């Protein structure tokens, strides 16, 4: 699924490039020539995500499989210009993701269990607030590639952290507040009326997110040492 998303992203970006033919080989009329000279600019983004978990274990047993699904991102952008090559960006948004943990039946050796106990679906809705620095190349006709990186904080609205029911009642609990670092690449494309930006970004949690079950011998959490989110964002920005 992630490969299909990436291929779609690449074809979409290529189609934009083709509509802006001869970008590199010929001087051409510049769209929105003074757009990047504004000290402040605003916009919004829409996109997709694929979230995963990086899990460290206390003992060497069969890994928990993470079944990924495509999620959705939407948010706003505030951009502060430093100079022609550096910008600071704030991108508050809403991120919705879905993952399923699939356990081997070896986790339940000696225990009575049902088939449904082998999976735990984790639906997450984050209020996601990245603070980023954007480093751009020199503008080439109507495009400008860039890299971006920074840190973000996220509030998981569906964490179940304070839920008194744990996995014994079907609830996998996670912490509410998380911190990530982010790294990405993208291309600003200057169209006639606005700037369009496709980008790819990796997000990586800096905190252990799992909340252990009340039972210290729980088959779902007792062997997890750390569990951290990692994910891929594909965003389309309009400014």
What annotation goes with each model-predicted range?
Residues 55-65, 97-124, 157-174, 210-225:
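Flexible, solvent-exposed loop segments that connect beta-strands
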Residues 45-47, 98-100, 201-208:
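Short, solvent-exposed beta-strand-terminating loops
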Residues 38-40, 68-72, 123-129, 143, ...:
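Residues that define the transmembrane beta-barrel architecture of outer-membrane proteins
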Residues 178, 183, 192-239:
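Predominantly the C-terminal beta-signal and adjacent terminal strand-loop region
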Residues 31, 36-40, 48-54, 79-160, ...:
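Gram-negative (and chloroplast) outer-membrane scaffold detector with strong preference
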Residues 49-73, 77:
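Surface-exposed strand-loop-strand hairpins of Gram-negative outer-membrane beta-barrel proteins
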Residues 1-27, 236-239:
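Bacterial Sec-dependent N-terminal signal peptides
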Residues 18-43:
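Outer-membrane beta-barrel biogenesis signature
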